[in-house]
Protein backbone atom coordinates (compact mmCIF):
# COMPACT_ATOMS: atom_id res chain seq x y z
CA UNK A 1 0.00 0.00 0.00
CA UNK A 2 1.50 3.36 -1.03
CA UNK A 3 2.61 5.63 1.79
CA UNK A 4 1.09 9.05 2.33
CA UNK A 5 3.49 11.83 1.33
CA UNK A 6 5.40 13.72 3.99
CA UNK A 7 5.91 17.47 3.77
CA UNK A 8 9.56 18.53 3.91
CA UNK A 9 10.62 22.16 4.30
CA UNK A 10 13.96 23.52 3.11
CA UNK A 11 14.70 27.15 4.01
CA UNK A 12 17.20 29.23 2.07
CA UNK A 13 16.12 27.04 -0.83
CA UNK A 14 17.91 29.04 -3.54
CA UNK A 15 21.22 28.87 -1.67
CA UNK A 16 24.18 26.68 -2.52
CA UNK A 17 23.75 24.26 0.39
CA UNK A 18 20.06 23.75 -0.41
CA UNK A 19 20.91 23.25 -4.09
CA UNK A 20 22.98 20.22 -3.10
CA UNK A 21 20.52 19.01 -0.45
CA UNK A 22 17.20 19.17 -2.33
CA UNK A 23 17.97 16.46 -4.93
CA UNK A 24 19.20 14.12 -2.19
CA UNK A 25 15.78 14.43 -0.55
CA UNK A 26 13.91 14.10 -3.85
CA UNK A 27 15.79 10.91 -4.75
CA UNK A 28 14.61 9.17 -1.57
CA UNK A 29 18.04 8.93 0.04
CA UNK A 30 16.83 10.50 3.30
CA UNK A 31 13.36 9.15 4.04
CA UNK A 32 13.39 5.97 1.98
CA UNK A 33 12.94 4.90 -1.63
CA UNK A 34 9.22 4.25 -1.07
CA UNK A 35 8.37 7.50 0.75
CA UNK A 36 6.68 10.21 -1.40
CA UNK A 37 7.52 13.80 -0.49
CA UNK A 38 6.03 17.25 -0.97
CA UNK A 39 8.78 19.86 -0.90
CA UNK A 40 8.16 23.25 0.70
CA UNK A 41 10.87 25.68 -0.43
CA UNK A 42 11.24 29.01 1.39
CA UNK A 43 13.27 32.00 0.20
CA UNK A 44 13.49 35.76 0.52
CA UNK A 45 11.35 37.74 -1.96
CA UNK A 46 14.44 38.98 -3.83
CA UNK A 47 15.57 35.37 -4.39
CA UNK A 48 12.30 34.01 -5.78
CA UNK A 49 13.41 34.23 -9.41
CA UNK A 50 16.45 32.08 -8.57
CA UNK A 51 14.23 29.67 -6.63
CA UNK A 52 11.94 29.35 -9.63
CA UNK A 53 14.96 28.08 -11.56
CA UNK A 54 15.52 25.42 -8.88
CA UNK A 55 11.86 24.40 -9.21
CA UNK A 56 12.25 24.08 -12.98
CA UNK A 57 15.22 21.76 -12.47
CA UNK A 58 13.20 19.64 -10.06
CA UNK A 59 10.41 19.35 -12.60
CA UNK A 60 12.88 18.47 -15.35
CA UNK A 61 14.47 15.86 -13.07
CA UNK A 62 11.20 13.90 -12.98
CA UNK A 63 11.83 12.47 -9.52
CA UNK A 64 9.29 9.65 -9.00
CA UNK A 65 8.89 10.32 -5.27
CA UNK A 66 8.41 14.08 -5.62
CA UNK A 67 4.64 14.69 -5.61
CA UNK A 68 4.58 18.47 -5.39
CA UNK A 69 6.83 21.51 -4.97
CA UNK A 70 5.62 24.58 -3.09
CA UNK A 71 7.94 27.56 -3.61
CA UNK A 72 7.15 30.59 -1.48
CA UNK A 73 8.52 33.65 0.30
CA UNK A 74 5.84 33.49 3.03
CA UNK A 75 6.66 31.68 6.29
CA UNK A 76 3.04 30.68 6.93
CA UNK A 77 2.79 28.88 3.59
CA UNK A 78 6.21 27.32 4.01
CA UNK A 79 5.73 25.98 7.55
CA UNK A 80 2.07 24.96 7.47
CA UNK A 81 1.60 21.21 7.92
CA UNK A 82 5.25 20.22 7.51
CA UNK A 83 6.58 16.97 8.97
CA UNK A 84 10.30 17.74 8.68
CA UNK A 85 12.34 20.93 8.41
CA UNK A 86 15.86 21.55 7.13
CA UNK A 87 16.58 25.06 8.42
CA UNK A 88 19.61 25.82 6.26
CA UNK A 89 18.75 29.39 5.32
CA UNK A 90 21.26 31.74 6.91
CA UNK A 91 23.81 34.42 6.15
CA UNK A 92 26.79 32.63 4.56
CA UNK A 93 30.23 32.72 6.10
CA UNK A 94 32.78 34.49 3.89
CA UNK A 95 36.59 34.55 3.83
CA UNK A 96 37.98 36.24 6.92
CA UNK A 97 34.74 35.91 8.88
CA UNK A 98 34.51 34.09 12.18
CA UNK A 99 31.36 32.20 13.09
CA UNK A 100 30.74 34.73 15.84
CA UNK A 101 30.40 37.43 13.16
CA UNK A 102 27.27 35.67 11.93
CA UNK A 103 25.48 35.55 15.28
CA UNK A 104 23.62 38.84 14.95
CA UNK A 105 22.02 38.15 11.56
CA UNK A 106 21.43 34.45 12.02
CA UNK A 107 19.96 34.72 15.52
CA UNK A 108 17.17 36.86 14.03
CA UNK A 109 16.61 34.39 11.18
CA UNK A 110 16.29 31.37 13.45
CA UNK A 111 14.15 33.27 15.94
CA UNK A 112 11.68 33.93 13.12
CA UNK A 113 11.91 30.31 11.94
CA UNK A 114 11.25 29.10 15.47
CA UNK A 115 8.08 31.16 15.81
CA UNK A 116 6.79 29.91 12.46
CA UNK A 117 7.69 26.32 13.31
CA UNK A 118 5.75 26.50 16.56
CA UNK A 119 2.76 28.25 15.02
CA UNK A 120 2.26 26.40 11.74
CA UNK A 121 4.15 23.08 11.65
CA UNK A 122 2.91 19.71 12.88
CA UNK A 123 3.96 19.19 16.48
CA UNK A 124 5.83 16.02 15.49
CA UNK A 125 8.21 17.92 13.17
CA UNK A 126 11.92 16.93 13.16
CA UNK A 127 14.44 19.78 12.74
CA UNK A 128 17.31 18.74 10.07
CA UNK A 129 42.58 9.11 5.31
CA UNK A 130 44.88 8.34 7.88
CA UNK A 131 44.32 4.52 7.81
CA UNK A 132 43.57 4.36 4.06
CA UNK A 133 40.11 2.88 4.61
CA UNK A 134 36.61 3.97 3.58
CA UNK A 135 34.62 6.12 5.99
CA UNK A 136 32.02 3.33 5.98
CA UNK A 137 34.61 1.14 7.74
CA UNK A 138 34.74 3.51 10.73
CA UNK A 139 32.06 3.77 13.41
CA UNK A 140 31.38 5.55 16.69
CA UNK A 141 33.62 8.57 16.26
CA UNK A 142 32.26 11.36 18.48
CA UNK A 143 32.06 15.10 17.90
CA UNK A 144 31.64 16.85 21.24
CA UNK A 145 30.36 20.38 21.78
CA UNK A 146 30.08 23.33 19.45
CA UNK A 147 30.14 23.59 15.67
CA UNK A 148 33.26 25.73 15.72
CA UNK A 149 37.02 25.57 16.07
CA UNK A 150 36.53 24.30 19.64
CA UNK A 151 34.63 21.18 18.56
CA UNK A 152 36.26 17.97 19.77
CA UNK A 153 36.59 14.97 17.45
CA UNK A 154 37.05 11.98 19.77
CA UNK A 155 38.12 8.50 18.60
CA UNK A 156 38.44 7.05 22.11
CA UNK A 157 35.50 4.69 21.55
CA UNK A 158 35.67 4.36 17.76
CA UNK A 159 36.32 1.18 15.80
CA UNK A 160 37.62 0.56 12.28
CA UNK A 161 37.36 -2.52 10.09
CA UNK A 162 40.87 -3.45 9.00
CA UNK A 163 41.28 -6.63 7.00
CA UNK A 164 37.96 -7.97 8.23
CA UNK A 165 38.73 -7.32 11.91
CA UNK A 166 37.20 -4.62 14.13
CA UNK A 167 40.05 -2.71 15.74
CA UNK A 168 40.00 0.30 18.06
CA UNK A 169 40.88 3.37 16.01
CA UNK A 170 43.31 4.53 18.69
CA UNK A 171 45.14 1.19 18.46
CA UNK A 172 45.13 1.20 14.66
CA UNK A 173 46.65 4.69 14.49
CA UNK A 174 48.86 4.12 17.53
CA UNK A 175 49.89 7.76 17.68
CA UNK A 176 48.39 9.89 20.45
CA UNK A 177 50.34 12.89 19.21
CA UNK A 178 48.55 12.72 15.86
CA UNK A 179 45.12 12.12 17.43
CA UNK A 180 45.44 15.02 19.88
CA UNK A 181 47.31 17.29 17.48
CA UNK A 182 47.12 17.18 13.69
CA UNK A 183 43.85 15.21 13.48
CA UNK A 184 42.16 17.52 15.97
CA UNK A 185 43.35 20.62 14.12
CA UNK A 186 42.27 19.32 10.68
CA UNK A 187 38.70 18.73 11.87
CA UNK A 188 38.42 21.96 13.85
CA UNK A 189 39.69 24.13 10.99
CA UNK A 190 38.06 22.29 8.08
CA UNK A 191 35.37 24.91 7.46
CA UNK A 192 37.90 27.71 7.18
CA UNK A 193 40.11 25.61 4.90
CA UNK A 194 37.21 25.00 2.51
CA UNK A 195 36.38 28.71 2.42
CA UNK A 196 40.02 29.56 1.72
CA UNK A 197 40.09 27.10 -1.18
CA UNK A 198 36.64 27.69 -2.72
CA UNK A 199 36.03 31.29 -1.63
CA UNK A 200 32.65 29.90 -0.54
CA UNK A 201 31.51 27.94 2.50
CA UNK A 202 30.93 24.19 2.35
CA UNK A 203 27.84 23.16 0.38
CA UNK A 204 28.17 19.64 -1.02
CA UNK A 205 29.58 18.10 2.16
CA UNK A 206 27.24 20.13 4.39
CA UNK A 207 24.23 18.98 2.38
CA UNK A 208 25.39 15.35 2.58
CA UNK A 209 25.85 15.71 6.34
CA UNK A 210 22.37 17.22 6.78
CA UNK A 211 20.81 14.44 4.71
CA UNK A 212 22.70 11.69 6.58
CA UNK A 213 21.75 13.28 9.89
CA UNK A 214 18.04 13.34 9.04
CA UNK A 215 18.25 9.80 7.65
CA UNK A 216 19.60 8.55 10.98
CA UNK A 217 16.93 10.45 12.91
CA UNK A 218 14.15 9.15 10.66
CA UNK A 219 15.27 5.51 10.50
CA UNK A 220 17.19 5.09 13.78
CA UNK A 221 20.75 3.91 14.44
CA UNK A 222 21.87 0.28 14.04
CA UNK A 223 22.44 -1.78 17.17
CA UNK A 224 25.74 -0.84 18.78
CA UNK A 225 26.21 2.26 16.60
CA UNK A 226 25.77 5.86 17.61
CA UNK A 227 25.89 9.21 15.83
CA UNK A 228 26.84 12.67 17.03
CA UNK A 229 23.87 15.01 17.32
CA UNK A 230 23.44 18.50 18.74
CA UNK A 231 20.71 18.18 21.38
CA UNK A 232 19.63 20.20 24.41
CA UNK A 233 22.28 19.62 27.03
CA UNK A 234 21.41 17.93 30.30
CA UNK A 235 24.86 18.43 31.78
CA UNK A 236 26.17 15.00 30.76
CA UNK A 237 29.95 14.52 30.77
CA UNK A 238 30.55 17.88 32.42
CA UNK A 239 28.90 19.93 29.67
CA UNK A 240 26.95 23.09 30.56
CA UNK A 241 23.18 22.79 30.83
CA UNK A 242 20.66 24.45 28.49
CA UNK A 243 22.79 24.79 25.36
CA UNK A 244 22.63 22.82 22.12
CA UNK A 245 25.62 20.51 22.56
CA UNK A 246 26.86 17.70 20.33
CA UNK A 247 26.87 14.29 22.05
CA UNK A 248 26.96 10.68 20.92
CA UNK A 249 23.33 9.51 20.76
CA UNK A 250 21.36 6.37 20.04
CA UNK A 251 18.11 6.79 18.08
CA UNK A 252 15.34 4.20 18.36
CA UNK A 253 12.69 3.10 15.86
CA UNK A 254 10.30 5.72 17.26
CA UNK A 255 12.77 8.49 16.35
CA UNK A 256 13.56 9.17 19.99
CA UNK A 257 17.18 9.95 20.82
CA UNK A 258 19.08 9.39 24.03
CA UNK A 259 22.59 10.40 24.97
CA UNK A 260 25.01 7.47 25.19
CA UNK A 261 25.91 7.18 28.86
CA UNK A 262 28.71 5.61 30.84
CA UNK A 263 31.56 6.37 28.44
CA UNK A 264 35.03 6.58 29.97
CA UNK A 265 36.87 9.82 29.35
CA UNK A 266 40.46 11.03 29.55
CA UNK A 267 41.46 14.28 31.22
CA UNK A 268 42.36 15.63 27.76
CA UNK A 269 38.83 15.03 26.44
CA UNK A 270 37.23 16.37 29.61
CA UNK A 271 39.21 19.62 29.39
CA UNK A 272 38.26 20.08 25.72
CA UNK A 273 34.58 19.50 26.54
CA UNK A 274 34.77 22.22 29.19
CA UNK A 275 36.37 24.62 26.70
CA UNK A 276 33.79 24.08 23.95
CA UNK A 277 31.01 24.25 26.54
CA UNK A 278 32.26 27.62 27.80
CA UNK A 279 32.20 28.97 24.24
CA UNK A 280 28.65 27.70 23.69
CA UNK A 281 27.40 29.42 26.83
CA UNK A 282 28.95 32.70 25.65
CA UNK A 283 27.41 32.34 22.18
CA UNK A 284 24.01 31.42 23.62
CA UNK A 285 24.01 34.51 25.81
CA UNK A 286 25.03 36.73 22.88
CA UNK A 287 22.33 35.27 20.63
CA UNK A 288 19.65 35.71 23.29
CA UNK A 289 20.73 39.32 23.76
CA UNK A 290 20.39 39.95 20.00
CA UNK A 291 16.89 38.44 20.02
CA UNK A 292 15.78 40.83 22.77
CA UNK A 293 16.92 43.94 20.90
Segments predicted by a language model, with ranges:
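N-terminal Rossmann NAD(P)H-binding glycine-rich loop of SDR-like oxidoreductase domains
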Residues: 10-14, 22
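C-terminal substrate-binding/catalytic lobe of Rossmann-fold NAD(P)-dependent dehydrogenases
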Residues: 126-293
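Conserved NAD(P)H cofactor-binding loop of Rossmann-fold oxidoreductase domains
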Residues: 89-91
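Redox-cofactor binding/interface segments in oxidoreductases and associated redox assembly factors
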Residues: 85-87
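Rossmann-like NAD(P)(H) cofactor-binding subdomain of soluble oxidoreductases
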Residues: 99-130
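Residues forming the Rossmann-fold NAD(P)(H) cofactor-binding site
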Residues: 19
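Eukaryotic N-terminal low-complexity, Ser/Thr- and Lys/Arg-rich leader segments
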Residues: 1-5, 292-293
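Conserved N-terminal Rossmann-fold NAD(P) cofactor-binding segment
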Residues: 27-82, 97, 285-288
